[in-house]
Design a protein with these regions (language model features):
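Generic non-transmembrane alpha-helical segments
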Residues: 11, 15, 156, 160-171, ...
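Metabolite-binding pocket within alpha/beta catalytic cores that recognizes anionic/polar moieties
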Residues: 1-149
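Short acidic/polar active-site loop segments enriched in Thr and Asp
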Residues: 105-106, 200, 219
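Zn-dependent metallopeptidase/amidohydrolase metal-coordination segment
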Residues: 204-242
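Non-catalytic positions within long, well-ordered alpha-helices that form the structural scaffold/packing
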Residues: 99-103, 195, 214
Length: 274
């Protein structure tokens, strides 16, 4: 489905004005309360934006916030759109497109994910170092140009974030994030396959945003909140309620980490551009 991105962007631009956006943040399932940690300048409901799809998932309210923190402006998306809701890939990446149109310096993408690795448990935070989406490359081909010979994850930026986490005494794991199309959770057999492939966590979002951002020279930091064990790891039945409950438990350290990142990113920017 083709989208007139400029038409989508215009009402948001009118609402937010001519501001310089430092960081764009996409909040995953159960992590929407983070926006309360920032000074909210103004906001717009996605229902008031031309052709903006409506998220149908609990915990994704569908609002875009202009926030101020640490003497900078940030745009925060509370409400993600997923492919499994029936939307096109061009709709799913709308928050990333808008972030780029605002000339954001960085994109922080967050998600709730199921833990596969024995090193991960619910309430852990994982910095995404690599991606696994073998079966979806054809679907995502329009997001990543073959002429851009670079890896989507910036190792130096990830190392910077990891060092920040140690300074504020937050345990941040690192690992490989696998994409699953949803809407159903993965089967135990699929999880065993992903484990053999050295994947650490699995979820139903994030990779489209990372690919679009990388292809459009928008540096990305991607963080998973491990909200449950993946299917077959334990005998517990998976549910969205478990996802949101665990995200609520982890929100204090999650908020501290994200606030620290957006505060310290100018230091990385100055270092990497000198």
């Amino acid at each position: 489905m083709k989208i007139d991105y400029q038409k989508v962007f215009e009402p948001i631009k009118r609402k937010f004005g001519d501001v310089k956006i430092k960081t764009a943040i996409i909040l995953g399932s159960g992590l929407g309360d983070f926006v309360e940690e920032l000074n909210q300048v103004t906001s717009i409901s996605t229902s008031d934006v031309n052709d903006y799809p409506v998220s149908t998932i609990p915990g994704h309210s569908g609002k875009i916030f202009l926030c101020e923190y640490s003497n900078s402006y940030h745009i925060v998306f509370k409400g993600r759109i997923h492919l499994y809701e029936g939307y096109s890939i061009n709709q799913v990446v709308l928050p990333t497109v808008i972030s780029k149109m605002f000339n954001a310096k960085y994109l922080i993408v967050t998600n709730a994910a199921g833990g596969i690795s024995e090193n991960l448990k619910p309430a852990d935070l994982m910095l995404i170092d690599d991606l696994f989406f073998l079966h979806y490359k054809a679907k995502f081909r329009e997001l990543a140009s073959s002429t851009k010979n670079k890896f989507a994850i910036n190792k130096e930026l990830n190392d910077f974030v990891f060092e920040l986490s140690k300074k504020i005494n937050i345990e941040l794991k690192r690992g490989v994030y696998a994409y699953s199309s949803g809407p159903s959770y993965e089967t135990p057999a699929e999880i065993r396959f992903l484990k053999i492939a050295d994947c650490d966590a699995v979820g139903m979002s994030t990779i489209p945003e990372i690919l679009y951002a990388s292809n459009n020279d928008l540096p990305v930091i991607a963080i998973s909140c491990i909200t449950n064990y993946a299917a077959g790891i334990t005998e517990n039945k998976l549910s969205h309620e478990e996802v949101t409950d665990t995200a609520n438990i982890v929100k204090e350290k999650f908020s501290k980490l994200i606030r620290t990142i957006i505060k310290e990113l100018p230091r990385y920017w100055n270092k990497s551009n000198n």
